[in-house]
Amino acid sequence: MEVYKKINNNVALARDAKGRELVVFGKGIGFASMPYELTDLSRIQRTFYDVNEKYLALLRDVPEAVFLAADDIADTAREELDCTLNANLTYALADHLNFAIQRSREGLNVQVPLAYDIQHLYPHEYAIAKQGLHELCRTLAVDLPDTEIVSIAMHIITAENEVGDMHSTILTAKVISELSAI
């Protein structure tokens, strides 16, 4: 694997054996002078393919721990919802969570008017978001308000809809059906 661009000491851009671009995470991955051939692939902790260009700058601005927590939430959503999610969910979540942590430190609290609706119309996404937020707060020793559960859930819902999978279509039809019954 050729590592060719440093993002920071632990994150870099690379090309795999097939020439596909990816982002690699690992202790000291970006420390060596670029470019170089990475032969010990066990040094890689995580890889990300199909990264949108606009999200690459986030890798410099968002702390690695926040990024990895966002990726854990995205992984849980992929596993538990058993559907394809937009490949950039991790980046969108990392950006949001980093900003939420900054707002929290400044004492700013944002209200989310759709909280009740999201919780009841998307219970699986809400549960994943709730679990993810509590794990993030525990791991990073931060205190974020429960309103962030809804924001995280909305990112997951958006990631479902951006790929246009059958799960989203069925869910939308179900919601419309329930609303029609009222």
Regions found by a protein language model. Name each.
Residues 1-182:
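A cross-family "folded-core" feature that marks the main globular domain of proteins
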